[in-house]
Amino acid sequence: MIDWKLVARLAGGIAREPPGTGYAQEGLGSFVEDAESRIRAYTAIAPGAPLPAPELVSRRGWIDANIETLRPVMAALEHRLPARAFAAGPLGHLARSATGVTLSAQLGALIGYLSQRVLGQYDIPLLDPTGGTRLLLVVPNLVDTAERLEANRDDLLRWVTLHEVTHAVQFSGVPWLRPLLAENLTQLLDALELRLHKPPPLRMPDGRELHALVDSARRGELAMFAIGRKNRPIVERLQTTMAVVEGHAEHVMDKVGAEVVPTLAQLRAGLDRRRSSRSTPLRVIERLIGLELKLRQYRDGKRFCDGVAEAGGIAALDHVWDSQDMLPSSAELADPDRWMARTAPARTR
């Protein structure tokens, strides 16, 4: 149903690739090795496999990588739609084709918009816990952000790289994390329903319609799929897990960054103002179904991790990775003391 060539063409047109690069690959590999060593020393999480080499990519390169990541996810979703979403016969086929054009245009607009914002990404196959991973750093966005923040470009690159390397250490060193993410996402896809508020056009969107799609992507309003109220616990589990993943990376990038990024305080203040750079393809899915979290995932997750580490040290926070049962509930995410009280017996064994 989705025309991926159309998705790529629209996304590339919206991305507006700027000329030039501004960063060199030289020395980045050694920095990643040093970052991994520092993160392991601070968190006591040991990766189970070598981390992927860092890649400096263009917006187009980020688009291509995310299309490949999203294709199996959307294919799994498409597989569930025909029997319940479209009538049989020629009219059903026509409706399916028109819906495919609309959905392709939405995805293209959304991916193109995000390609202008994302700074870095630890890219994992969302439904395949054993698939290969990539560590992507989006050069034009890093350059643009450094200029906007009036920040040191090399410091920004190091700091963002620390964030993504922390994700790499998490997902490689916590054996249950990727399977849990895949399981939760599969449950979410199973629960989604296709909702068409008006018949989609059987054609490419014109300039006015494409502009409206980009504006909707910016506001997180591309809700072509919806999840029923009874399935909200699935969403809550996925969101809470990702809040811990992101909050932990935010905590670590600041603690370890203090050792290697001289302008950390300036970067933290500037990035908190910018906060549109979350680095996972789940952002695309969230916006497509109206579940954009914006600041919440960073803010709540970091507040939880900072609170636990302040109360019990990094050793206490490390226990959040012991098992799925040690992940906080949504209530505990907002109140680290509740998590500390519940998990005290397990943490002291």
Placement of each model-derived feature along the sequence:
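Post-HExxH zinc-binding segment in Zn-dependent metallohydrolases
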Residues: G108-L119, S172-V261
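Auxiliary, metal-adjacent structural segments of Zn-dependent hydrolase domains
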Residues: F31-P140
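N-terminal low-structure segments adjacent to metalloprotease catalytic domains
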Residues: M1-M74, E78, A311-R349
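Short pre-active-site segment immediately N-terminal to the catalytic Zn-binding motif
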Residues: N141-V160
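Terminal, compositionally biased segments used for targeting/anchoring and flexible tails
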Residues: D128, L135, N141-L142, A146, ...
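Pan-zinc metallopeptidase signature
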Residues: F225-R349
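Solvent-exposed, acidic/flexible segments
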Residues: Q25-L28, D154, M242, Y298
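Active-site recognition of the HExxH zinc-binding catalytic motif
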Residues: L156-S172, C305
